[in-house]
Each structure stands twice: as C-alpha cells, then as structure tokens.
C-alpha cells in the first residue's frame, strides 16, 4: 500500500512517523464498531435519505489511529476531528478509551483555516460531487488552507488522505433530485496518502502563504500507478489534512504518536462520481470555476437558441451586408451602398464599373436582347444565360486590346467564357443548327450557337 505512494521524502519520513501504521490503522478502523461515524453537516442533503445511517457527534466517536496516531489529551486542540479555524473558533474535542498522548509542542498549537469556506458551504448545501476518472481528475473546489502556530524554524510535512463517510453506496434519484442509499459499500480501495510537493519545508514557509493541494487527483482506477487517490464511484468521502513534524531525533519512531496533527472540515465531504448527477452542482461548478470560462459565454437556457446558424453573429452580419448584383443602369446611381462599392473594386482599388470595357461587357451579359452579330450570343430566346453558356464571336474577340481588359487575368477569363459545356442528356428543342464561319478559319467560332437565325443564313461553301 505504501509502495504506491511516490514521494522522494517517504524514506526520510519513515524515520520520523510510522506512515504505514498511520495509513493502515486509520483506514482499517472504518469497518470496526464505533469507527468513523461522521455527524451530518447542517443542510446535508444526504442525512434525510439515509434510513440506516445513525449519525453521531465527533465527540462520541473518535478518529482512531491505532498505536501510531492516538488522540490528544483533553483540553488540547483536537488533532483528529477538529475544524480548527482561528476565525470561527469551531474546535472539536474528542475522547478516547486509552490514555491520550500529549502532543509535541511543535504541533500542539497549530491551527488551520479552510480557504474558500463560503464556496465549500454552498456546495455542501447541494451535496458536493467530485469527478473521478481513470486518468485522474483534480478537485474543485481545490482544498486550500491557511496554517497558523507553526515553529518558523521547524520542518513540517503536509499530507492528505480520504476516508469513507459510511459503509454505503449511493444512487441519485433524478425525479426527486436527491441521493438514496443503493446498498452496501464496495470493497475498500487501496489507501493512499498525498504529500504536498513542497514537503518538507520550514514552518515559516508554510505560514507565509496559502497551502494549495491543486496537484491532487482523484481516480477510480484500482491499478493506478501515478500515485493518485483511488476512490469508489457513488461513495461518500471525507478529506483529512495532516501536519507532520519532522523530528530530528534519532529515536523519533518512539515519538511518532505525538508528532502529527489532523484536521477535518466536514463541509469538504463529497460523493465521488464519474459524471455530475445534480444539475445544480454542474451549474455551480461552471459559475465558480475559473477554468470553465467557455461554458459561461452564454446562459445555459439560451444554448439551443444561440447555436442555431441563423442566430450566429457572423450569419447576421453576412445577411445585413449582402447586396444583390445590380443591373448596369443602376451602377452610376447614388443609392449604391458601401458593400456594393467594395464589390465594384478590384484588388488594386480601381472602380470596375467606371471602365467602359466593363460596362460594355456587363451590358452584353445582362441585356435581354443581345444582338446576334455581336460578341455574345445566348443559347435560346429568353432570359440571359449564365456566363459558362456563352461563346465569343470572332468579330469581338480580337477587337478589345489586352491592356483594356476589365479583369485582372484576361487569359483565364477568356478560357472560362470559351469553355465547352457538357453535352445535354436530352435534346434541346430551342437550339437551332450551328454554323461554321469558313472564311474566318477561327476554331473559337466553330461551336457558336444561334437561336435567332436559321441554318439557311450560313453558307458552308465558298462564295
């Protein structure tokens, strides 16, 4: 069990405190009679749904540590079931059947204050849930404390462990938004201790800053080899915070019982889950977790409405900025908006519609009555055809100089207009025969279609 604890100070700590006995005895006493019967916190949502749970105060049942971790003598600050906060003054005392051991002065006067207590209380009122994953998940709220009363020049180690609140397994009833007892607890997981990465350190260093266990991770992987805390899902747990004095004496093993002090904050108890069960817990975690900013961009009630494509800001802006392509008669009017003026400019910023060549081209493309001998000839009588259905007449193809071409890449544009369309899968009744201008000998005119003239207007023989 202790071999799973990865800490460079484990060997050193074994000379000052019997960690094996400390962990094994504290966890094995859970199944014993009169073990860890924690009193329910005020407003605890679990207490009213536990028909077989017999709450008892911390003063009636102590946190038994066996031979390694006895209780302090009466009158001293409790080292096991005490939420010792200087501001609140809530210090619990407990009694033991065996004679209490006097604590070392290095730890006897230590008090601990829980940070973010108001947030912990808010979660506790709803029934705190902590996610456990195979890879390990950090706690939120993070367990953070402020320590007082240490010897500034003494060395201390800080560690945490987690003990089951009871011997029950729970399930969440969504219809009543409450937790119910689902049966007896699963077999106990391997007991582990999490050492603060800065341990050991001088008391002055611990007291000058808030101590945060933000590296602690919870997992449900029984074969975890990363040193994470292993918990059973749908079980309730109580975190415990331990301060261990690093005794420099050679025979420090004899004083292991008096060189540590334990603090328990009942508002930090939680249920281990693989997914949040209470939606209020989910909302509170999103609202209070600084790393959940992405979930706070919009109200959860508005998510379906805000994620419709038509309601996206980009789509709205695009719809407002769209302007239909105007006819050539409107290009010079004063009603042109900014969007149209941007459309009428090429990459160099030169207005295109002001060019005579561009106006001539657009008039041929968009006019309803295109002349047959002109440059562009429609496929059939009716509305103008798209550009890919148009063909260049040989009379107008070479009449326009290259440097006056309205488009930036005239060669590519001419090939685009002169590209052959795919053959129609059915006959087109409106298409007449095609004529071939023999005297020009221009291949560009070989496939020119005309709907205005009859085949007789073109002669296949020389004149």
From Swiss-Prot:
Gene3D superfamilies: Transcription factor, T-box. Induction: Up-regulated by retinoc acid (RA) in the pre-placodal ectoderm (PPE) during post-gastrulation development. Up-regulated by retinoc acid (RA) before, but inhibited after, neurogenesis development. It holds the Pfam family T-box. Residues 119-297 bind DNA. Residues 333-347 have a biased composition (Basic and acidic residues). One of its GO terms (molecular function) is RNA polymerase II cis-regulatory region sequence-specific DNA binding. InterPro entries: p53-like_TF_DNA-bd_sf, T-box_DNA-bd, T-box_sf, TF_T-box, TF_T-box_CS. SUPFAM superfamilies: p53-like transcription factors. PANTHER family: T-BOX PROTEIN-RELATED (PTHR11267), T-BOX TRANSCRIPTION FACTOR TBX1 (PTHR11267:SF104). Probable transcriptional regulator involved in developmental processes. Binds to the palindromic T site 5'-TTCACACCTAGGTGTGAA-3' DNA sequence. Induces pre-placodal ectoderm (PPE) gene expression in regions where RIPPLY3 is absent. Plays a role in the formation of the anteroposterior (AP) axis during embryonic development; required to establish the posterolateral border of the pre-placodal ectoderm (PPE) acting downstream of the retinoic acid receptor (RAR) signaling. Binds DNA as a dimer. Interacts with dscr6/ripply3. This is T-box transcription factor TBX1-A. It comes from Xenopus laevis (African clawed frog). The lineage of its organism: Eukaryota, Metazoa, Chordata, Craniata, Vertebrata. The gene is tbx1-a.
């Amino acid at each position: 069990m202790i071999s799973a604890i990865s800490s460079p100070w484990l060997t050193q700590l074994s000379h000052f405190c019997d960690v094996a006995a400390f962990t094994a005895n504290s966890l094995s006493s859970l199944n014993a009679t009169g073990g860890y019967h924690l009193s329910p916190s005020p407003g605890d949502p679990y207490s009213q749904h536990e028909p077989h749970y017999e709450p008892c105060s911390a003063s009636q049942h102590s946190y038994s540590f066996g031979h390694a971790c006895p209780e302090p003598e009466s009158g001293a600050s409790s080292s096991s079931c005490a939420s010792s906060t200087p501001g609140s003054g809530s210090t619990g005392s407990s009694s033991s059947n065996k004679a209490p051991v006097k604590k070392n002065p290095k730890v006897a006067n230590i008090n601990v204050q829980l940070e973010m207590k108001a947030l912990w209380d808010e979660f506790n009122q709803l029934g705190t849930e902590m996610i456990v994953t195979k890879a390990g998940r950090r706690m939120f709220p993070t367990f953070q404390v402020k320590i007082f009363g240490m010897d500034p020049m003494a060395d201390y180690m800080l560690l945490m462990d987690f003990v089951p609140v009871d011997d029950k397994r729970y399930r969440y009833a969504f219809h009543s938004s409450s937790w119910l007892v689902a049966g007896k607890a699963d077999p106990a997981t391997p007991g582990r201790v999490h050492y603060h990465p800065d341990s050991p350190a001088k008391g002055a260093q611990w007291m000058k800053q808030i101590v945060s266990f933000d590296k602690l991770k919870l997992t449900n992987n029984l074969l975890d080899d990363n040193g994470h805390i292993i918990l059973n899902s749908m079980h309730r747990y109580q975190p415990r915070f331990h301060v261990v004095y690093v005794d420099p004496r050679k025979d420090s093993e004899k004083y292991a019982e008096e060189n540590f002090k334990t603090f328990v904050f009942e508002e930090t108890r939680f249920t281990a889950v693989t997914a949040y069960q209470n939606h209020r817990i989910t909302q509170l975690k999103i609202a209070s977790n600084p790393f959940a900013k992405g979930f706070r961009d919009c109200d959860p009630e508005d998510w379906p409405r805000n994620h419709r494509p038509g309601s996206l800001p980009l789509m709205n802006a695009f719809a407002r900025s769209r302007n239909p392509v105007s006819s050539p008669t409107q290009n010079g009017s004063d009603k042109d908006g900014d969007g149209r003026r941007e459309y009428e400019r090429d990459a160099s910023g030169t207005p295109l519609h002001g060019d005579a060549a561009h106006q001539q081209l657009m008039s041929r493309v968009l006019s309803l009555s295109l002349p047959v001998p002109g440059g562009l000839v429609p496929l059939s009588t009716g509305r103008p055809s798209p550009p890919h259905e148009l063909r260049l007449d040989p009379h107008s193809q070479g009449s326009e100089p290259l440097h006056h071409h309205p488009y930036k890449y005239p060669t590519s544009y001419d090939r685009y207009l002169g590209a052959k369309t795919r053959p129609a899968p059915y006959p087109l009744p409106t298409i007449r025969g095609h004529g071939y201008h023999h005297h020009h000998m221009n291949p560009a005119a070989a496939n020119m279609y005309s709907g205005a003239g009859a085949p007789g207007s073109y002669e296949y023989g020389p004149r």
